[in-house]
Swiss-Prot record:
The modification Phosphoserine is found at residue 180. Belongs to the APC5 family. GO terms for biological process: anaphase-promoting complex-dependent catabolic process; cell division; protein branched polyubiquitination; protein K11-linked ubiquitination; protein K48-linked ubiquitination. Its main location: nucleus. It is found in: Nucleus; Cytoplasm, Cytoskeleton, Spindle. InterPro entries: Apc5, Apc5_dom, Apc5_N, TPR-like_helical_dom_sf. Keywords: Cell cycle, Cell division, Cytoplasm, Cytoskeleton, Mitosis, Nucleus, Phosphoprotein, Repeat, TPR repeat, Ubl conjugation pathway. The lineage of its organism: Eukaryota, Metazoa, Chordata, Craniata, Vertebrata. It comes from Mus musculus. This is Anaphase-promoting complex subunit 5. Gene3D superfamilies: Tetratricopeptide repeat domain.
Amino acid sequence: MMTNGVVHANLFGIKDWVTPYKIAVLVLLNEMGRTGEGAVSLVERRKLNQLLLPLLQGPDITLSKLYKLIEESCPQLANSVQIRIKLMAEGELKDMEQFFDDLSDSFSGTEPEVHKTSVVGLFLRHMILAYSKLSFSQVFKLYTALQQYFQNGEKKTVEDADMDREDGEKQMEKEELDVSVREEEVSCSGPLSQKQAEFFLSQQAALLKNDETKALTPASLQKELNNLLKFNPDFAEAHYLSYLNNLRVQDVFSSTHSLLHYFDRLILTGAEGKSNGEEGYGRSLRYAALNLAALHCRFGHYQQAELALQEAIRIAQESNDHVCLQHCLSWLYVLGQKRADSYVLLEHSVKKAVHFGLPYLASLGIQSLVQQRAFAGKTANKLMDALKDSDLLHWKHSLSELIDISIAQKTAIWRLYGRSTMALQQAQMLLSMNSLESLNAGVQQNNTESFAVALCHLAELHAEQGCFAAAGEVLKHLKDRFPPNSQHAQLWMLCDQKIQFDRAMNDGKFHLADSLVTGITALNGIEGVYRKAVVLQAQNQMTEAHKLLQKLLTYCQKLKNTEMVISVLLSVAELYWRSSSPTIAMPVLLEALALSKEYRLQYLASETVLNLAYAQLILGIPEQALTLLHMAIEPILADGAVLDKGRAMFLVSKCQVASAASYDPVKKAEALEAAIQNLSEAKNYFAQVDCRERIRDVAYFQARLYHALGKTQERNHCAMIFRQLHQELPAHGVPLINHL
């Protein structure tokens, strides 16, 4: 049988076969042995030795590309190889026969050129053995394929030379020796040998895990896998890589199909490595059910996942497989984590994992416990102590992936508690770390979910501080590192949409913000509904906004999403006082404050106090409002977003002006001067985030204060700024005092 110039008989009996490309590699090895040591420098020989391994392990490539790779290492040898192949291809069949007869001489003599047990020696012996098993008709077909391979290579070389003459400025990009397999390389090759297939699969699996951008596209990879499976349907590893590839495109049917085929083939090929056949069979069955449960859970099919998990537990109990049962226990927690008693299950899972010596599962359990306790309002020091214990496990067992997850989780916890400086430090720590995993297959970066989460936090933190250019650079890096079709792309898509939404709202472009709500809702339904209510509120559609917020509040309370519950309560309170009902807003704000204190959400608590102070200002008690502000303003100025800093300083100015109404003239003038300084600081904060609507409000207040102090020139300057912004921005008929 012959396919694409590859002569092979029984695919399951022969681990390697002869192809035109491998003949070219044999010519290279032969020329390296014939060339004297003086003809090739030590540096060139070192480069050639480094080149050999990817040439022997990788898939077949075109002859022109092979010439280029050899020429980069040793131009003289590339010319010799080209001449030798040309003489063989343009000669007769006996030239190829003689070439293979001469290969055996490499092992002869007291000091042979090649040792039989070396990598090159094993390759030569495999090729000689495979060639000797060919019939005469197969040898003739191989020689015909070699001629065609040479002609295609010569044609490509001429075309490249013409292109170089037409455009001398374009330089050929140098290929690294360990680059990932390119699509054009794979497409030119025939069916891979067993070693080539194993190398290809391990390379693509490593790329899918760590650097998906360098892996083949889903369609191209699936095409190659189908080609592999066509010649060897029982290749279990190919089925598993097909399963991973289908997960990239969210194809639940094909991924399930490939996963089941993988475990079927494990049983057929005896890959379980068990002396007892029944034990290996049962192991495949229970782990197949467990992986099927994980797959259904990934796609949100929780009922099917629970049924598959029950099947895995039943088989594992029959076989007394404690390791499998521990995995099942972990997935039971994932499926039932919304239940009130789920933490008991998780604690039991961690204890059992430690007992059976499963550090990976134990660490995952600890991190899940930390996440659950963070949402339950436990103190940060206890959570960090627990993460420190899990980090000891990571470093002890070199669990690189879990180290990354731990640091990313610390970043998220610090942001949850409103400590942006600590979150920024943790995110940068993760990005500057080197992975403990060996870098192979050209993987130079760790493109895991942890890195995507850390980069998204970094972009949002920069955007909060008004550094939109820096946030844009981070997002650009995210888009390059995680393309839109990759599995973690939704993280940066949501982050990008939220930043654009906030900028549009700050700039008063509510129609643009409204158009972004659809994209946010597609990625995160709760966040999208909340943002829709914010837009409606900004457009003075109070009735619609109130209905939406009430529905969202009920839903989030049911889900126990405390952070969103507090945000919704703050929006409801703002809606009340903008509707001239500040007394109704007070109980809502007190409820939000109680939740913030209970769950130790410091930043949300400070923001709630800020809103309480504003409500008291509206109710005519500015002195009490100032007292509250002194409690809340320090965390906001230390860790808050620039917009919140501006709002806080603006509110301080309003309270100072309102409190000065009963002062004597001298003290009142001092209070107004202090208020003007605070207004200038607030204006600087608003300018950083390009919030022109609030700058307009500040300019209005400054003009009024300067007028009260008799400073005509400063008043006119502020009035001019106010007028310019008032003409540019739409007026919604909301009194300035009712806008925090």
